[in-house]
Each structure stands twice: as C-alpha cells, then as structure tokens.
C-alpha cells in the first residue's frame, strides 16, 4: 500500500456529550481518520498521535463550576487548528482568557444563527438570507451557559438573539468555536461546516475510504498472522460476517469459521448462513448443531439475565470444544468494533466519563493461548456495513434490523421450549415478510415478534381453540437510546395478525406493543 490511511488524522476530545461519537462518525464520513479520547489526555499522548486538527466535544457540565473538565493546555500550543463545539467552545473561551456565564435563557433545540463576519469555517454556508443580507443557519442548540466575552485575538462570527457569541474564531491561530452542534442532522449545514474544518482548515486529504480500509486491513492481517491458522466464531451477524470476508480475502483457506446453531436463530437462518458463506463465498466453515445442548441448558430457567448467561456460557463451551479439534490454530478472530473499545483508557486523571467499557472477548478463558485478531477494531457500525458491501455481502443482510446475541432466548418470555421457538420463528418470519412486501421494513428501525407464555381463547371455524399469544413490536429510533413505537397502518397489522393466526396452528391471538422507550425497553427481556 503506497499511502498510509492513518497519516491524515483528527483528534476528538470527549467532554461527555451524547453526540461525541457522532462527531467521529461525521469526520470518518468526510474521509479522514480520527480517534476519540478522554478530555484529560496527556501532552505526550497528543504529540505521539500527531493530529492535523483537534475537535473539543460538547458536554453536560458547566465551565463555571470548580473541577469541571478542561482541555489540556497543549491543545492550544500544538500549532494545529482547533474546533470547540458547545462545551468545547466554552472551555476554549474560558481557558484562553474569555468569559463564560450561566445564561438567563437556556437554548435547547432548533435555533437560527446569523453569520455576522466571513470566516473559513462558515464560508459560503447558508440556509436562508436575512433582511439585512446576512446568511442564516438552521442549527441545533443544547446549552445553558454561554460565552459572554471572547478571548483576546478572537472575533465573533455568528450570533443569535439570546447568544451574542454563537461562533468565534482566531484567524492567526485557526481556533474556532461554535455554540451549536454541527454533528447532528438537525443542523442542516453541519456536514459542510465539519468538512470545511477538516479538509480546508486542517488541510486533510480524503484517504479514509471503504476500498482503502479493506486494503489496509488485509495487509495488516497478513502481516500479523502470516501463514498461521485463524479461527472465527461466525454468527451470521454484520460484524462477524464482515470479519469473515476480510480474513478470507487475506488468508483464504487458513481461516476456519465455526458456526454454532443453537436453536435460537430466525427461520432458516442457519441454512442461509451455510449457503452464503460456504457454498457461495467458499469459506471453510464448520456447522455445529447444538440445539439440543442449548435447550437442555435452558430448562427451568425463567430469569432473562440467567438465560443470557446460560446461552453465553454454553456458546463458549461449544466453541472451545470445536476449536480444540483444529490442529495448529494460533489465532482467534473477533468482530470487535470501535464503539466496543472506546473507554477511559486515555484518561490520565480518572475523572473522565467512561463512554463505554466493553470487550468482545468476554467469557473466553484467561489462559487462552490463541492470539487475537480484530480487523474491525477501528470501525464504526456504519463503516463496517460499507466495507461489507464493498466485499460483496448482500445489502439486505448488512442492513437487517438488530438481532440480540441470545437470539430468541430473550424473545420467548420465561422458560425456553422448542415448541415456543418454532412457533415464534414462523410468526416472526410472516411479520418481516409483510414489512418487506409493504415497503415498511427500512422505514422502521427494528421490528420483531415476541412469544408470550400465556394462552388465550379463540375460535377457528366452529371450534373453540385455546392457544398461545404473540406480540408484534416495531420501533422508530435514531440511536436506540430512546424510541417511539412505530405507527404501522391498521390494515397492515390486521393482515399480519390474520396470516399468523390462520397459518400457524398453536397461536390464537396477536397483539401490538405500543410502549415507547422509556419507560419500556425495546426488547421485552
């Protein structure tokens, strides 16, 4: 590879905003590599990372409070452009000699910003033109404090009626601050603003593309594992599937995939995984039929957390047994992605908020002698999907709705039985089939069916029946942290209900879940 795709890089310092990962995803979309670190990173770490620009995120705290987060002084001494977003702008102003005050009017939600002075950051960006000829921007605000006095050397470049310094910059040092959130879609020109910062102000090149990421990953896999054998637990989910395709392209037959059919998958899913990866793509894949083992292990267990643990532990046991049969295996591959590994490891003081502390290895023995290969470790989910398309995986598979790790184990309420799983599989398949037929599948964020272990009276022909109940669940959400129930058409719901009751012997009633998150969770267990 002639160009190192990591050479052009932006550093994002996290001050605790719920939108921080979104900033990183936007920078990646622009085509530039970036990393997300805790706000209290050391000077040495910044020097070693050697960014071409730094972005300071928003955050929930107040700059005016003692002990609130601050950017390292070196951020403003490194000689690279800096963009402060919301709290990031406030701490920039405070640290460089300006003033920040609590505002008598808190701004949350839509606002219109007036551009009052030209700058490289807001150049040629407008949503409308005001009566005075000034550019107006539709933006998303989320702040209580505001910059009351800008630091020496800065100029105000935008304002709102209640926020006189909605954006500021220091032309000489190329420091910029915006009180709004350019990373969210509600800020209509936010992507253009970030692009102008990353490409025009920081002078980055667009090296971070799907094709380049694949080429880089393949080179690194080859360099790491050489001619040695790699094992991968293939689930058929997005992350493990893309990992499998990357490894297959890099090392071919030296990859062995182990697919564990635990009896908790969707209708025909196990056969589809084998057909796609074994027959179509030619991967070396071992199928383990472990339905009986898993169902035996789950007998008598009703508590959702105990079910999850039982399923996870049994999977590790089955996988370890299969791995031990493979001679000369030196490496274990996993589909760990970037949000899994973002944590407070970069926190020098221990004060930084943990975004997420997680590792995909959970449950593997500590004395495991296999080395670890994680080719997706730097990637966000949307990037994984893009390179999956580039590698030839089908769109419908990459953009399927989320499916929980324990599978139907948490969609059958209470104790798991084969009868319940078989009924649920068929009902869920009808629901999903009808969503596709009505062109509704991609319009909802997640849809599935839940088996309720209660019987209900019904009538079929002239006969009374006393059978099981299922619930349909469909939600709309951006981040899965909050969700609204999807307002699917009544005629559609009626059709799905009629098909399930008429086609599946054993189900007498279908209900629709109209709970939002909060207070309910998306999954029932």
From Swiss-Prot:
CDD domains: GATase1_GMP_Synthase, GMP_synthase_C. It holds the Pfam family GATase. GO terms for cellular component: cytosol. The keyword Ligase applies. The keyword ATP-binding applies. It comes from the Bacteria. ATP binds at residues 235-241. InterPro entries: Class_I_gatase-like, GATASE, GMP_synth_C, GMP_synth_GATase, GMP_synthase, GMPS_ATP_PPase_dom, NAD/GMP_synthase, Rossmann-like_a/b/a_fold. Keywords: ATP-binding, Glutamine amidotransferase, GMP biosynthesis, Ligase, Nucleotide-binding, Purine biosynthesis. Residues 208-400 form the GMPS ATP-PPase domain. The active site is at residues 86, 181, 183. Pathway: Purine metabolism; GMP biosynthesis; GMP from XMP (L-Gln route): step 1/1. GO terms for molecular function: ATP binding; GMP synthase activity. It catalyses: XMP + L-glutamine + ATP + H2O = GMP + L-glutamate + AMP + diphosphate + 2 H(+). Catalyzes the synthesis of GMP from XMP. Homodimer. This is GMP synthase [glutamine-hydrolyzing]. It comes from Alteromonas mediterranea (strain DSM 17117 / CIP 110805 / LMG 28347 / Deep ecotype). The gene is guaA.
């Amino acid at each position: 590879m002639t160009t190192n795709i990591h050479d052009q890089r932006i550093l994002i310092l996290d001050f605790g905003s719920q939108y921080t990962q979104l900033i990183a995803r936007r920078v990646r979309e622009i085509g530039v590599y970036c990393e997300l670190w805790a706000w209290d990173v050391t000077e040495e770490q910044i020097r070693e990372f050697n960014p071409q620009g730094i972005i300071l995120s928003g955050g929930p705290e107040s700059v005016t409070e003692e002990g609130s987060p601050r950017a390292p002084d070196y951020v403003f001494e490194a000689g690279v452009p800096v963009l402060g977003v919301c709290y990031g702008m406030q701490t920039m102003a405070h640290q460089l000699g300006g003033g920040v005050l609590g505002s008598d009017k808190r701004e949350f939600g839509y606002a219109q910003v007036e551009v009052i002075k030209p700058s490289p950051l807001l150049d040629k960006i407008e949503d409308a033109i005001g009566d005075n000829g000034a550019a107006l921007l539709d933006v998303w605000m989320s702040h209580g404090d505001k910059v009351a006095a800008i630091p020496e050397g800065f100029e105000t470049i935008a304002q709102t009626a209640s926020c006189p310094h909605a954006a500021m910059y220091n032309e000489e040092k190329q420091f910029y601050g915006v009180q709004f959130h350019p990373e969210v879609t509600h800020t209509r020109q936010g992507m253009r603003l970030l692009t102008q910062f990353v490409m025009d102000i920081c002078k980055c090149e667009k090296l971070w593309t799907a094709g380049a990421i694949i080429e880089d990953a393949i080179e690194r896999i080859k360099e790491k594992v050489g001619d040695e054998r790699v094992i991968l637990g293939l689930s058929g989910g997005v992350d493990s599937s893309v990992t499998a395709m990357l490894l297959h392209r890099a090392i071919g037959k030296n990859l062995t995939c182990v697919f564990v059919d635990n009896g908790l998958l969707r209708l025909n899913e196990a056969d589809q995984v084998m057909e796609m990866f074994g027959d179509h793509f030619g991967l070396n894949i071992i199928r383990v039929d472990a339905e009986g083992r898993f169902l035996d292990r789950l007998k008598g267990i009703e508590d959702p957390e105990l079910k999850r643990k039982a399923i996870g532990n049994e999977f590790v046991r089955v996988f370890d047994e299969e791995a031990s049969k493979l001679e000369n295996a030196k490496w274990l591959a996993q589909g760990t992605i970037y949000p899994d590994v973002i944590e407070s490891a970069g926190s020098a003081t221990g004060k930084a908020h943990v975004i997420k502390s997680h590792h995909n290895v959970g449950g593997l023995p500590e004395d495991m002698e296999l080395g670890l290969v994680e080719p997706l470790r730097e990637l966000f989910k949307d990037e994984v999907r893009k390179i999956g398309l580039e590698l030839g995986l089908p769109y419908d598979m990459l953009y399927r709705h989320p499916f929980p790790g324990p599978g139907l184990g948490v969609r059958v309420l209470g104790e798991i039985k084969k009868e319940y799983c078989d009924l649920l599989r068929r009902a869920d398949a009808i629901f999903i089939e009808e969503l596709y037929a009505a062109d509704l599948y991609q319009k909802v964020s997640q849809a599935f069916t839940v088996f309720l272990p209660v019987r209900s009276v019904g009538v079929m022909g002239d006969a009374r029946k006393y059978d099981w109940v299922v619930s349909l669940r469909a939600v709309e959400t951006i981040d899965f942290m909050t969700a609204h129930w999807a307002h699917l058409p009544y005629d559609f719901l009626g059709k799905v209900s009629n098909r399930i009751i008429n086609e599946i012997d054993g189900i007498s009633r279908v209900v629709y879940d109209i709970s939002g998150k909060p207070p309910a969770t998306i999954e029932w267990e």
